[in-house]
Amino acid sequence: MKQGIHPDYREVVFQDSSTGFQFLSGSTATSDETVEWEDGNTYPLIRVEITSDSHPFYTGKQKFTQADGAVDRFNKKYGLSND
């Protein structure tokens, strides 16, 4: 592996902007902001819009309205029933 061409891989804290949920993970992302983690160490803070704490797939608040409409149109077009 060539030296000096790869970004630094280190532990960073990701924070969900909508819920405030934070988790520690490894990343090459950089940030000027830092935060003190539960272990007492200071890590770079990366703010993200969506995490597993706020994404509808993980929270169970999914909406399938668009997909359901497509299925209904298909069934109607080909004379199929939804049973």
Curated annotation (Swiss-Prot):
One of its GO terms (molecular function) is structural constituent of ribosome. It comes from the Bacteria. Keywords: Ribonucleoprotein, Ribosomal protein. HAMAP family: Ribosomal_bL31_2 (MF_00502). Belongs to the bacterial ribosomal protein bL31 family. Type B subfamily. Part of the 50S ribosomal subunit. This is Large ribosomal subunit protein bL31B. The gene is rpmE2.
